[in-house]
Amino acid sequence: MSYANEEFEGSYDPYNYQADYDMHTGDPKQDLAYERQYEQQTYQVIPEVIKNFIQYFHKTVSDLIDQKVYELQASRVSSDVIDQKVYEIQDIYENSWTKLTERFFKNSPWPEAEAIAPQVGNDAVFLILYKELYYRHIYAKVSGGPTLEQRFESYYNYCNLFNYILNADGPAPLELPNQWLWDIIDEFIYQFQSFSQYRCKTAKKSEEEIEFLRSNPKIWNVHSVLNVLHSLVDKSNINRQLEVYTSGGDPESVAGEYGRHSLYKMLGYFSLVGLLRLHSLLGDYYQAIKVLENIELNKKSMYSRVPECQVTTYYYVGFAYLMMRRYQDAIRVFANILLYIQRTKSMFQRTTYKYEMINKQNEQMHGLLAIALTMYPMRIDESIHTQLREKYGDKMLRMQKGDAQIYEELFNYACPKFLSPVVPNYDNVHPNYHKEPYLQQLKVFLDEVQQQAQLSTIRSFLKLYTTMPVAKLAGFLDLPEQEFRIQLLVFKHKMKNLVWTSGISALEGEFQSASEVDFYIDKDMIHIADTKVARRYGDFFIRQIHKFEELNKTLKKMSQKP
């Protein structure tokens, strides 16, 4: 059921108030404070269409909770009635809320929870859910972003939400659409990331703000964030469910009291992806991939229903592989998800916020793929390769010539926003303190680039010959023979990667080389072999014929009368 669109079309303007005061004092800080106070006062007068929407939203959530309570008492996991209510909430969440936001609150906050509380009978659970949307909108759209108080209030609201879900005597009587559950975990980590960077920028903060931060070190503390994510994983028993699911068993058999319910199951799964993201932001790439050890990335599953979750998973796994020098795996991961985005892009354009997020990560992954392919050339899907040449052809050529500035530029654009888990010393914070986590990761990356600076040139020479005296090739490169031998050893070492071949864990693998050239040295001669595999068009056509035959059989079965 969609909230009636004609009710959006009223002529009410929430900003058009007649008032006999002047908002400009000449002092920017006073003006900003006065303006915010003014906005909060005006929202006490809530448009009728917003009142009606909130009452309808509350009734839908309340009806679902009542039905869930009944089914929990009857020892049922779910029903068609619950599914229908979840579908209605999804429509409100993805369509009605977005339309009303665009019309009434494009760059300003929704009414505060206290203002709408009488409309919903002070329903505590609904107000927690409403605040989650309220603060998320402030972070995303409101000019100037959240105040320090709003950052704290949003944290406490997430604490209330997760306490309600995790600390109940039994499963909480609540179900939400998968998209909203993913957005809750995604936003929770984003706000932690935002606060971690915010608290490090002390130059423009007042003494009062700094003292407030100093006296509240546990707010948005990394341990509390990790604790929430691990608690959701443990409560849902999701790792055991995934283990059984990937081995062909029934995950319900090991789900337990909580994990049988969609709320816990999906929050548990999304929390695994959240842990992947959080460990990547902290620079712990091994642990980032390890948390996904029961998720088989190379297969579709019943859990991969939210496109943004899929894209985020592949982005962070690919980036972690890149930083671990597992270039072949990074290239495979990026190429797979970019192909997926390319083929399903039209479905993301239905909602703007999804499209913006996926489009940004799509561009970032193209940049990371350009880096990986420059450092480890190998064959990828032709359509992705064509896109890459169009976007980064010139930059890839400059990177092949060892231009460290281009590497740094692309890394800066495409990497995640790293953060430090440590609360800063507020008595001595230098202006660039918030950049230190990024600069540390950049240094690690550029050190690796520097080690490989000569490899692209060596590779281009090796492709031209089958045998060549070591001294002669060293002369071509203007290198002393001993230094050239060291570079050849570096080439051998860097072109051999740990590569995932089979199994569930993304950390497993075998040492392989996918380099288009290989060589060995016999005394003072280099013997070179071109290992480039010619395109096998026959295999492609055979696969397409098999797919066509399977499709034909399926269509025939569908056309047969029962």
UniProtKB/Swiss-Prot annotation:
Key word Protein biosynthesis present: yes
GO molecular function, one term: translation initiation factor activity
This protein's encoding gene: eif3l
A Pfam match: Paf67
Name the UniProt record assigns to this protein: Eukaryotic translation initiation factor 3 subunit L
The organism's taxonomic lineage, starting at the top: Eukaryota, Metazoa, Chordata, Craniata, Vertebrata
Species name: Xenopus tropicalis
PCI domain ranges (all copies): 329-535
Keyword Protein biosynthesis: yes
Record's GO cellular component terms: eukaryotic 43S preinitiation complex; eukaryotic 48S preinitiation complex; eukaryotic translation initiation factor 3 complex
